[in-house]
Each structure stands twice: as structure tokens, then as C-alpha cells.
């Protein structure tokens, strides 16, 4: 039970943040393309890379931080199920090029963002 609480609280914070980002992106760009999911998944991947880099650098493990931020907040903030659904919505609307670009941008963007976060932390002075 000790590990469940930080995950639950972090998940609530992350899900709330995702909702706010989604509302802002929808108001800014409209519903034509799932910019909200693309942005939260890339930003969340960058944050995960930063977190992993910081935890590795600290050498203390930071189990509670990992549970709260990595599993809870970032698990609630990013969303693979929405990514999957939005791909199929684009595809079914006949927007196969946009659907393909969405997959590439999401996967490549998230991988690059996570790696960038880890590299950024490694560049900081000890």
C-alpha cells in the first residue's frame, strides 16, 4: 500500500494536466488533428527522460519520486490509448497521409524527446 499512494496521487495530477493541455490545444488548433495527444506524449517522454537522467545521476534510487512522477504523473499525463484511437479516426476519415504522419511524429518525437531529456541531464555539471 505504501507504493500505491504516490502512484494514485501522481496519476490524478498527470490526468488533470493532460485534460488542461487538451483543452488549451483544442481551443488553439481545433479538432482537425490530435495535437493534444501528440504534444502530451512528446512532452511526457521528455519529462521521463529528464526524470530517468536525474534519478541515475543522484544514485539514491528515488523510489518514491519514480513512483509519483514516472508511474503516476507521467502515466496519467501521456496516453497510448488516445494515440491509437486518434490514428484510427484519422484513417477512417480518409486522412491516411495525416494518420501515417501522426504515427511517425508521435513515435519518433517521443523517442527523441526521451533521449534528449537523458542527454540534457548528463550535460549538467555534477
Swiss-Prot record:
Belongs to the fluoride channel Fluc/FEX (TC 1.A.43) family. HAMAP family: FluC. GO terms for molecular function: fluoride channel activity; metal ion binding. Its main location: membrane. Na(+) is not transported, but it plays an essential structural role and its presence is essential for fluoride channel function. This is Fluoride-specific ion channel FluC. It is found in: Cell inner membrane. It catalyses: fluoride(in) = fluoride(out). It is a multi-pass membrane protein. Signal peptide: none annotated. It comes from the Bacteria. Fluoride-specific ion channel. Important for reducing fluoride concentration in the cell, thus reducing its toxicity. It comes from Sphingopyxis alaskensis (strain DSM 13593 / LMG 18877 / RB2256). Keywords: Cell inner membrane, Cell membrane, Ion channel, Ion transport, Membrane, Metal-binding, Sodium, Transmembrane, Transmembrane helix, Transport. It holds the Pfam family CRCB. The chain crosses the membrane at residues 35-55, 71-91, 101-121. Na(+) binds at residues 75, 78. One of its GO terms (cellular component) is plasma membrane. One of its GO terms (biological process) is cellular detoxification of fluoride.
